[in-house]
Design a protein with these regions (language model features):
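Short inter-helical turns and helix N-cap capping residues of alpha-solenoid HEAT/ARM repeat scaffolds
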Residues: 3-4, 36-37, 67-69, 81, ...
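Glycine-rich, flexible loop segments associated with nucleotide phosphate handling
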Residues: 3-13, 76-92
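Conserved hydrophobic register position within alpha-solenoid helical repeats
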Residues: 11, 44, 88, 121, ...
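Amphipathic alpha-helical scaffolding segments comprising HEAT/armadillo-like alpha-solenoid repeats
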Residues: 1, 20-34, 53-75, 98-110, ...
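Residue-level detector of extended alpha-helical repeat arrays and alpha-solenoid scaffolds
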Residues: 8, 41, 81, 85, ...
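Extended, low-complexity, acidic/polar intrinsically disordered regions
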Residues: 67, 76-83, 87, 185-191, ...
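Structural signature of alpha-helical solenoid repeat scaffolds
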Residues: 16, 49, 89, 93, ...
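Long, ordered, amphipathic alpha-helical scaffolds
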Residues: 115, 126, 147, 154-158, ...
């Protein structure tokens, strides 16, 4: 029932946060990735990403293989997509295995009609390849007219640790708390220029 699914979703989320102690749960999470419940599949994908479960790559790629017109199509009578593409894409980025088959599955989602999906795809490609063009795509989304999209791009830049975007992050029309979270991501996840001192000074200016 609905209540059981809610419990299962919470369990999948909790498993992701218990990494690496939850490695034994990976087979169950892979099974859950095939569940009929959208929320369960989403929670399982996020947990697999948090666990950096490289054995999940094939299943995640299979879920996305039909591209924006398949996995990324909107369900009938629902705002949801056929598959939880945002979570699936982000899981591949968090697992962090840069292989041609993964890149080939992710790249078509850069053309998805929903900017949140485009942001997730750019984040994943940035995490996997480190190529500046994907960071620049995320910076462009910081100017999007919808606040929800700007928020997502902030979080995606932070998750990818792309330090060249720090000034654009600081200037984004969004809550300072989110900008601080994104900048903290640059400090924790990123390396190179600018250095930590410049990033921390930028954070201080937002406090």
């Amino acid at each position: 029932g609905v209540e059981e699914n809610a419990v299962a979703r919470n369990a999948a989320r909790a498993l992701g946060k218990l990494a690496p102690a939850a490695q034994t749960a990976i087979p169950d999470l892979l099974d859950t990735l095939q569940d009929a419940d959208d929320g369960l599949r989403e929670a399982a994908a996020r947990a697999l990403g948090q666990l950096a479960a490289s054995e999940a790559i094939e299943a995640l790629c299979e879920k996305l293989a039909s591209g924006p017109a398949g996995a990324g199509a909107q369900q009938a009578n629902s705002p949801r997509l056929v598959e939880p593409c945002e979570a699936l894409l982000e899981a591949l980025g968090d697992i962090g295995v840069n292989e041609p088959r993964v890149l080939a599955v992710v790249k078509p989602f850069l053309e998805h009609e929903r900017p949140l999906i485009r942001s997730a795809a750019a984040r994943t490609l940035l995490q996997l390849s480190g190529e500046a063009r994907w960071g620049e795509l995320l910076v462009d989304l910081l100017d999007h007219p919808q606040l929800q999209v700007r928020r997502a791009a902030l979080m995606d830049l932070g998750a990818a640790g792309w330090r060249p975007g720090f000034q654009a992050i600081a200037a984004t029309l969004a809550e300072n708390s989110l900008k601080l979270m994104a900048l903290r991501g640059l400090v924790e996840q990123g390396n190179g220029d600018p250095g930590d001192e410049a990033l921390l000074a930028c954070m201080d200016a937002l406090l």
